[in-house]
């Protein structure tokens, strides 16, 4: 049995979508643009709490060790690189090819292709990881189980926490005397950048749109949403306090966070689809404009934003 076929599919498992044209290991290198610099390691969170299928038959202590091993992270990172190749850089099916049926979501994640891509990446590394098919089989018996863990790895809380940390650090660095208009513009620029410049954000969007009823996708998205809302609630109250903005009694800071988060999500999706953030006739980014429009409805004294903090 070859590396392509061994354990590729657990009996009865089906994945939605259509076939895709995959990139070869010899093609141009694609670096995943994360919220940290390319080439740096992913956050060293405890993957044993996230990956439910890796080394599933091993003893708990052994499973934890395998889940957090450099090789396990490497297999998952390579899988994300291949998904970037197939889903984000894909140009669509070849309509002149009778055998090209389009893109299947996880069709390109064969063991052989993972190893081939790992070897291609290792050629650029000072310390090659030397991944093998045997290492893969020690971790995942079926491709479907690897795919489940890859989804969990992509959506895991540590990545959201890292993004929130990036935005939080940017907010802390804003001068205390910064005018309200400039504060809003700078915060919007950072919020848009941490997603639009992030290949993993694009992959997460593809996965949750393609698999909206997947239990683990739903679980991770709910946790991600709640974490963002909790952060925005605290941040907006603190920033509004700089200018003495008084919230209308019928609203809470949680409401403000819900509204602005929904606006930001829509603006990011639109920008991702069109290639740039939408601008209003005033020249403002659409998210900046929406925030300014909402101020009179949310605050008793919106004129306070025109005063220096």
Which residue ranges define each predicted feature?
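C-terminal peripheral helix-coil segments that are non-catalytic and often amphipathic
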Residues: 2-66, 70, 241, 266-309
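Amphipathic alpha-helical packing segments from all-alpha helical-bundle domains
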Residues: 195-205, 215-244
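An amphipathic alpha-helix signature
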Residues: 111-115, 185, 229-237, 257, ...
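Hydrophobic alpha-helical segments that form the core
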Residues: 200-203, 248-270, 283-294
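An amphipathic alpha-helix adjacent to DNA-recognition modules
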Residues: 76-77, 137-168
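Helix-turn-helix
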Residues: 97-150
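Hydrophobic alpha-helical connector segments
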Residues: 162-199, 257
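Short hydrophobic clusters on alpha-helical segments that form packing/core surfaces
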Residues: 75-99
């Amino acid at each position: 049995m070859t590396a392509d076929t061994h354990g590729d599919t657990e009996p009865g498992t089906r994945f939605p979508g259509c076939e895709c044209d995959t990139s070869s290991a010899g093609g141009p290198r694609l670096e995943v643009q994360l919220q940290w610099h390319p080439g740096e390691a992913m956050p060293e969170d405890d993957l044993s709490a996230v990956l439910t299928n890796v080394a599933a038959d091993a003893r708990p202590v052994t499973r934890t060790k395998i889940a957090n091993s450099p090789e396990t992270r490497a297999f998952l990172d390579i899988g994300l690189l291949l998904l970037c190749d197939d889903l984000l850089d894909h140009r669509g099916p070849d309509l002149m090819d009778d055998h090209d049926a389009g893109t299947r979501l996880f069709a390109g994640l064969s063991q052989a292709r993972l190893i081939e891509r790992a070897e291609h990446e290792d050629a650029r590394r000072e310390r090659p990881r030397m991944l093998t098919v045997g290492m893969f089989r020690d971790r995942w018996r079926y491709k479907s189980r690897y795919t489940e863990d890859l989804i969990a790895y992509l959506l895991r809380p540590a990545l959201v926490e890292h993004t929130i940390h990036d935005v939080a650090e940017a907010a802390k660095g804003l001068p205390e005397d910064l005018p309200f208009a400039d504060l809003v513009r700078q915060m919007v620029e950072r919020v848009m950048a941490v997603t639009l410049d992030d290949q993993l954000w694009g992959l997460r969007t593809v996965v949750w749109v393609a698999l909206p009823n997947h239990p683990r996708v739903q679980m991770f998205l709910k946790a991600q949403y709640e974490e963002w809302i909790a952060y925005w609630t605290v941040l907006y109250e603190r920033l509004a306090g700089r200018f003495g903005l008084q919230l209308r009694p019928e609203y809470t800071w949680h409401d403000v966070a819900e509204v602005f988060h929904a606006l930001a999500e829509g603006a990011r999706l639109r920008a991702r689809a069109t290639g740039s953030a939408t601008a209003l006739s005033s020249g403002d980014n659409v998210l900046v404009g929406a925030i300014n429009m909402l101020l009179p409805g949310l605050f008793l004294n919106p004129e306070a934003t025109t005063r220096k903090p």
